[in-house]
Amino acid sequence: MEKVLVFGHKNPDTDAICSAIAYAELKKELGMNAEPVRLGEISGETQFALDYFKVEGPRFVETVASEVDNVILVDHNERQQSANDIESVRVLEVIDHHRIANFETSDPIYYRCEPVGCTATILNKMYKENGVTIRKEVAGLMLSAIISDSLLFKSPTCTEQDVAAARELAEIAGVDADSYGLEMLKAGADLSGKTMEQLISLDAKEFQMGNAKVEIAQVNAVDTNDVLVHQAELEKVISAVVEEKGLDLFLFVVTDILTNDSVGLAIGKAANVVEKAYNVSLENNTATLKGVVSRKKQIVPVLTEAFQA
């Protein structure tokens, strides 16, 4: 039987990795030869979840066409966030919870996108719809994805469906969602030992906003100053990325997981758009973004609107 690769976006977060594993397992149960893979390094937060539930991480690939003809995308749809040669393969399915942009296919596909906080929430429904029992370990990973994407249910992207799914999955996994979740988020917020290059690419995504090419990277921290103490070095590596990729804006967002506020470091010729979007003034290229924790709901649409205004 021909193999199908299942993967999330580049610079994968916990949902991208865990939903690839969970959906590949569901597809295998339904008779498909599916293998989860990843398009980037595994973060400390995701590794914590994999270790806790004793699951091996997917192997790393940059290109897919040399291996397979067909792929399934989870947690993304935009071409620039996908495999480097995504144009050379057929996308069979997409399971996602983001905006739909820069995406088209030559054939009809199964496309499931719901306005929930996490791909794993959708997968929880799909397991039920197909009458497949979720293994304890996979339930733990799916729970981890929801906790990560919802910042332990505090993000404005979090819906009642996400909370309900998390409670169900926690029961299957045999953990307390709140205490496990805080432990996992703290593991993800431990940025010690990371290079500046790693920090700005841990969870980074590229977007086309009007005519502007924008990259938004986000890291969680227990104290934003632990990251911003390295601002000069961060600006140096970000400026290099801006030049290399021809970006109009690179916004590096440091989110405090305790206060649920963020600090944005804006580099590029369109940095002033951040000021316009949030009605703030950049001081030394940074601004506090009160109550902003979600790239999907509080950054991407706000910046897109500002660029198009």
Curated annotation (Swiss-Prot):
It is an enzyme of class 3 (hydrolase). Its EC number is 3.6.1.1. Binds 2 manganese ions per subunit. SMART domains: DHHA2. Keywords: Cytoplasm, Hydrolase, Manganese, Metal-binding. Mn(2+) 1 binds at residues 9, 13, 75. Mn(2+) 2 binds at residues 15, 75, 97, 149. GO terms for cellular component: cytoplasm. The keyword Cytoplasm applies. It comes from the Bacteria. Belongs to the PPase class C family. One of its GO terms (molecular function) is inorganic diphosphate phosphatase activity. This is Probable manganese-dependent inorganic pyrophosphatase. Its main location: cytoplasm. Its cofactor is Mn(2+). It comes from Bacillus cereus (strain G9842). The lineage of its organism: Bacteria, Bacillati, Bacillota, Bacilli, Bacillales.
